[in-house]
Amino acid sequence: MVGLIEFLAHNLVDEPESVEVRPIRDDRYATVVGLRVAESDLGKVIGRQGRVVRGLRALVKAAATRKGTRVDLDVV
């Protein structure tokens, strides 16, 4: 799942070397994955009224559900 998030984030931002994806918390119900990008790219990842980040979260949840797990995405 981290690979999918990294791929999507790298293609959204201007500074792909600043993209950092790592699991924040992993309990028996869900894994929370944190996405960190450069300050200048934060608006691109969030999007207008949060549309881009909502789309990212939907893709990640769909991929996780397909694998039988639950993953939540946080932009840190």
PLM-predicted stretches and their roles:
Residues I46-G50:
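Glycine-centered tight-turn and secondary-structure capping sites
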Residues M1-L42, G55-V76:
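RNA-contacting regions in translation and RNA-metabolism proteins
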